[in-house]
Amino acid sequence: MGNLLKVLTREIENYPHFFLDFENAQPTDGEREVWNQISAVLQDSESMLADLQAYKGAGQEIRDAIQNPNDIQLQEKAWNSVCPLVVRLKRFYEFSLRLEKALQSLLESLTCPPYTPTQHLEREQALAKEFAEILHFTLRFDELKMRNPAIQNDFSYYRRTISRNRINNMHLDIENEVNNEMANRMSLFYAEATPMLKTLSNATTHFVSENKTLPIENTTDCLSTMASVCKVMLETPEYRSRFTSEETLMFCMRVMVGVIILYDHVHPVGAFSKTSKIDMKGCIKVLKEQPPDTVEGLLNALRFTTKHLNDESTSKQIRAMLQ
């Protein structure tokens, strides 16, 4: 255990200092049941990302159909192009529901008494790593989705076509797979700029409200501790030298940003207030020290998907750092 998570004896600025081995942490017997459950979800995450990355959309076919409304052949071509894409979008949406359940199981394990968040991380490094992997996936998914306007265009065309056919009393086969209720929920999901992050944020808020006997600090301290762990690993050369690849560096940055955003949505006053347990200036500084093209998406996530950045109580210095 000691070689997986090393707690340093020094405490600087009262923030926890750890090295959490994101590359090699393995589950203990006590973690295995939850770890297996989360692992079954995470094993599909790479194929989801590959699928989203390959998503080209049916923009040309839709334009042709709209410009030539009386050409039945072009209407059919557009419809036949869009339907398989909508099935793919449904698969992404359904994965978000699985991720939501997975996160709630993890939060249950990582926040339950009598242990503190620090003790949980010491005892359950493999679960902490899975939590990190969920955040990593989430930010990668949302980065890809934000860069792909075809998703909403395709889905809007699909919904318009379904509505038009319903008026004409036509039932299309795809409605057996994506019925009206499912389409409504998918519509709300894809309307979000960062749908997966919104899912995690809602899941965390729901977890806090459902577990009324659990102090909210148990959840927010779990998030702030994880953010501190990542920041320290990124800014300490002896830790960074332990990463075996650049991808682990990116992983660590994405996880840090992900937990900051979650903290900001769940904590009553957010991540940017003076009483926040996250060193926001330090976290932003660490990001800004990286090559700009690798962190622009992460800085944008802090700018546009946090809840409290523009509160009056947020220091001008922090706001200026994110200009």
Swiss-Prot record:
Alphabetic keyword roster: Lipoprotein, Membrane
Molecular-function annotations in GO: small GTPase binding
Domain of life: Eukaryota
Gene Ontology BP annotations: regulation of actin filament polymerization
Membrane association type: Lipid-anchor
Location of the protein in the cell: Membrane
InterPro entries: CYRI, CYRIA/CYRIB_Rac1-bd
GO-annotated cellular components: membrane
Family stated for the protein in its record: Belongs to the CYRI family.
Function: May negatively regulate RAC1 signaling and RAC1-driven cytoskeletal remodeling. May regulate chemotaxis, cell migration and epithelial polarization by controlling the polarity, plasticity, duration and extent of protrusions.
Protein name: CYFIP-related Rac1 interactor A
